[in-house]
Amino acid sequence: MIQQETFLNVADNSGAKRIQCIRVLGSNRRYAHVGDIIVAAVKDAMPNMSVKKSDVVKAVIVRTKATLRRETGNSIRFDDNAAVIINDDKNPKGTRVFGPVARELRERNFTKIVSLAPEVI
């Protein structure tokens, strides 16, 4: 579960390394899960890239440490909290996605992120 002030790793090559959640988008929501969109501030970034430190960006969560229950009864959990930075059209800013992503992103119409990911769990 991701909430305000949570730090996340960035799982793409947009230039940001770590972001901090400012707000979970949605009607008065407190927690975000896989596939939810958040507003975040870039806390650590690589030089000479499109995303700079202290930029405010939108991101979609692709991995969480919290257990994710599926309708089949399976549960899945990742080693870190990670997000992919997106633009206003819900397309990723980077051209690569690192690490596995959850299958729930396909159901939420983030097919571009799923196609860029090396592994979908």
UniProtKB/Swiss-Prot annotation:
Transmembrane segments: none annotated. GO terms for biological process: translation. One of its GO terms (cellular component) is cytosolic large ribosomal subunit. NCBIfam families: rplN_bact (TIGR01067). InterPro entries: Ribosomal_uL14, Ribosomal_uL14_bac-type, Ribosomal_uL14_sf. Gene3D superfamilies: Ribosomal protein L14. Part of the 50S ribosomal subunit. GO terms for molecular function: large ribosomal subunit rRNA binding; structural constituent of ribosome. This is Large ribosomal subunit protein uL14c. The keyword rRNA-binding applies. HAMAP family: Ribosomal_uL14. Belongs to the universal ribosomal protein uL14 family. The keyword Phosphoprotein does not apply. CDD domains: Ribosomal_uL14. Coiled coil: none annotated. Keywords: Organellar chromatophore, Plastid, Ribonucleoprotein, Ribosomal protein, RNA-binding, rRNA-binding. Its main location: plastid. It is found in: Plastid, Organellar chromatophore. It holds the Pfam family Ribosomal_L14. It comes from the Eukaryota.
